Amino acid sequence: MPVNSTAVSLASVTYISVEILIGLCAIVGNVLVIWVVKLNPSLQTTTFYFIVSLALADIAVGVLVMPLAIVISLGVTIHFYSCLLMTCLLMIFTHASIMSLLAIAVDRYLRVKLTVRYRRVTTQRRIWLALGLCWLVSFLVGLTPMFGWNMKLSSADKNLTFLPCQFRSVMRMDYMVYFSFFTWILIPLVVMCAIYFDIFYVIRNRLSQNFSGSKETGAFYGREFKTAKSLSLVLFLFALSWLPLSIINCIIYFNGEVPQIVLYLGILLSHANSMMNPIVYAYKIKKFKETYLLILKACVICQPSKSMDPSIEQTSE
């Protein structure tokens, strides 16, 4: 069937080309995010530590996940556990992203609920513990199939060693649906939506009360409202990018097959999320836009880059 063969080949080439483009954009964009935070002291706050963690996860998607996804799409014959490790790495950085988003949401919640005690609660030690916990959970969830929850145990051929490396050849779909999606993606997404709903509710109440006309307090909650809007947009884009692929996995598990082109589109959309956040920061956070321009001058116009003056307007923590 030469027509079908050509169609599949064309779909694969298109998929690989788009993956490479997305990967490059994700790497460049998120390296810029980290560079911006390094250059701008007003962005070196608790929330932006978690944003840097999210950027690192997105860089890993560009550097590791997308090349591995391309190898898996080609079905290269390798050892079972090498293939399984590759697919587990795909899972680790997905969960690192959602854990970082959850940490950001909790941080903003503490900021508006504990306005006076916030700095005492969010100590440097606790920030590093939270970051470590995010990544520890991500590795444990992502590497769970390596400890037995994989296709080798459910395969009729227990001596299976080498095989064409494809996602469903090694990864069990009940792990993907019940453990990865329902437990570690869907539940955190619902929790984060509830957190942001409460943040907006608290800010709206405080602004309507106006605190006896205190301009300083009004300005604080105004900044918090803008920050919460920007970060909730990041969360919305994550959900928009990852839910389609998760739903496709549910369809495969409960109902059978989906067209290969639909699967490719779901994968590409999920990976595209890694290049979206730097764009959101540039458009929604003034300090990011200013520092992006500073870097552009340094790189394109050959002016030396330097840290921005910490005395300039501070981003709310």
Swiss-Prot record:
One of its GO terms (biological process) is G protein-coupled adenosine receptor signaling pathway. Residues 1-14, 73-84, 149-176, 255-260 are extracellular. Disulfide bonds join C83-C165. It is found in: Cell membrane. The keyword Membrane applies. GO terms for cellular component: dendrite; plasma membrane; synapse. It is a multi-pass membrane protein. Receptor for adenosine. The activity of this receptor is mediated by G proteins which inhibits adenylyl cyclase. PANTHER family: ADENOSINE RECEPTOR A3, OLFACTORY RECEPTOR AND ADENOSINE RECEPTOR. This is Adenosine receptor A3. The lineage of its organism: Eukaryota, Metazoa, Chordata, Craniata, Vertebrata.
